[in-house]
Design a protein with these regions (language model features):
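Flexible mid-to-C-terminal extensions adjoining Fe-S/redox cofactors in radical SAM and related proteins
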Residues: 193-261
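Generic structural signal for short, solvent-exposed loop/turn connectors between secondary structure elements
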Residues: 56-68, 132-149, 189-198, 208-212, ...
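A C-terminal junction/extension of Radical SAM enzymes
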Residues: 115-190, 232
Length: 261
């Protein structure tokens, strides 16, 4: 998966031509500031791969009918919400018959309740709740995001998935992020692997496999490495990085039948 946000469209297109065909493209940011967007869309339209546009409902703009039915729009909504602007955004997408999904960025229980009111009032069908860590809402995360033993044990998992989690990070593996200056990150929370102006995609992949911290980040650190549920839990996410804690759960590793609530 490639998430793109870069100023030089021609350089980006040249770079993308060196990549495999069967990948997902995600364009993230303010579409009004993307130069030669039509040219980029024309290039992406040559491929049958999945394509997404990720943007905020405030700075949302459908660049042209050239995008119609090509992209899945993932529209982020943060609080407080400008209802008038939200209606304009969703109506614009509906008018062009574009597929879209609303993502509510939730930082508190109050945000969650307000989001539900909007979903029910405006009969929104496709939506997600995206917990946002602010640095000040750890209690909200402990109550609503951290896993309990029952959460871990109730998750279905194949033998294949069990072993995959011991080798790679399911959240990050295979993803790169191309920034406006051309820097390439496997995860934007870690230093850049290189730049599209100076490194080939193959060099960047090799560097991530050999030296990177993202694709192969698994639960092999304390306290997870001493927990009997080590490989049953989801792969580490960005939340662990932002919060500065390797385990986002209530499991007591010294007594798995008890929980740290």
């Amino acid at each position: 998966q490639r998430q793109m946000c870069i100023r030089d469209r021609d350089k980006l297109i040249d770079y993308l031509q060196s990549m495999p065909d069967n990948i997902t493209y995600s364009i993230s940011g303010d579409l009004k500031h993307i130069a030669k967007f039509d040219k980029l869309v024309d290039f992406l339209n040559q491929y049958n791969s999945s394509k997404k546009i990720i943007c905020n409902y405030i700075n949302f703009a459908i660049p042209a009918s050239v995008c119609k039915n090509i992209f899945l729009y993932k529209i982020h909504i943060h609080f407080p919400i400008d209802i008038k602007q939200l209606i304009i955004t969703t109506q614009s997408l509906k008018d062009q018959n574009n597929l879209f999904e609303l993502i509510f960025d939730i930082a508190s229980l109050d945000d969650y309740l307000k989001a539900w009111e909007i979903i029910e009032e405006y009969q929104i069908d496709k939506y997600q709740f995206n917990p946002i860590y602010t640095g000040y809402n750890i209690d909200f995360f402990k109550e609503n995001v951290f896993l309990k033993k029952s959460d871990i044990l109730s998750t279905s998992m194949s033998i294949k998935d069990f072993f995959i989690k011991q080798m790679i990070n399911n959240n990050d593996f295979g993803k790169i992020n191309i920034m406006p200056n051309g820097d390439v990150h496997s995860n934007i929370n870690y230093p850049a692997l290189g730049n599209i102006c100076t490194h080939s995609i193959f060099e960047l992949i090799q560097k991530e496999i050999e030296e990177g911290k993202s694709w192969l980040r698994v639960r092999n650190q304390e306290p997870c490495n001493a927990c009997i549920y080590q490989w049953l839990c989801p792969s580490p996410s960005d939340y662990e990085i932002m919060i500065g804690q390797t385990n986002l759960c209530h499991v007591n590793i010294h007594n798995p039948n008890c929980e740290n609530l």
